[in-house]
Amino acid sequence: MLTAGPEGSGPTVAKDGEDESPKGNPLPRTTTANMALPAAVVGIVVMMVIPLPTTLLDLLLSLNIAAAVLILLASMNVTRALDLASFPSLLLVATLFRLGLNVSTTRLILGEGEAGGVITAFGSFVMGGSVVVGLVVFLILVVIQFVVITNGATRVAEVGARFTLDAMPGKQMAIDADLNAGIIDDAEATRRRTEISSEADFYGAMDGASKIVKGDAIAGIVITLINLDGGLIVGVLQQGLAIGDATSTYSLLTVGDGLVSQIPALLISISSGIIVTR
């Protein structure tokens, strides 16, 4: 294609496939990896609004448990906290996903009196025919997660963030001294400065992410109480069940739902504690 050339010269021919428009700042390319996180968050929000069939809910609950196990294994295999620098974002998405599942299971428990095979299996296995046993086991798991692991991990993250920020000026001065003495070159100095900045950002993010885990533990307790009390009200007043039958049915589903949500939450809390204590 003919285009106008410089002043005093003839027309030039543009090569095939060459863009004739002026080159500006290129827009960032949208890749599958970049779209995975927004798509996951949108899917979780949709899951909170739209009722899910029991088959899909069983699949998502199993996926939640498997993801928590994988996160725990990944946190145990890192040697430094920065080796898993995306852990705060991963923690946020996992917590949001678990809360979305809690909303979906609560809708099924109160609306239809069932919540799929996974929750029923967990409730039957742990309770062993006794409502008291199931509730006691659930409360023990909540106490372990909330009082022991979550509070400890939150405190470690707070102290780590504070000491990392306090130590930054001294580390920067040490890098400058090594650079001026010729011990390291410019590339190594840049790498060390970047690592220090990344470490401060990581512990600051983990400080906030630990608060999310703590709030998730509180939300789990509240949701369990809502499921139990709301199930009794729905069973007795709307479905006409006897108090004993309503207690047996909805306590089984409530304990199963609580265990299915608390076991992944416990695993991720342990992962958080392992990461911040590296």
For the regions a protein language model found, what residue spans apply to each?
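Hydrophobic transmembrane alpha-helical segments of multi-pass transport and channel proteins
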Residues: 99, 143, 147, 254-266
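Juxtamembrane helix-loop transition segments at the membrane interface in multi-pass membrane proteins
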Residues: 2-7, 12-27, 57, 64, ...
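N-terminal membrane topogenic signal
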Residues: 25-38
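Hydrophobic core segments of alpha-helical transmembrane domains in multi-pass membrane transport
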Residues: 39-50, 70-75, 95-97, 137-147, ...
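Membrane-interfacial loop-to-helix junctions in multi-pass transporters
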Residues: 33, 128-133, 263
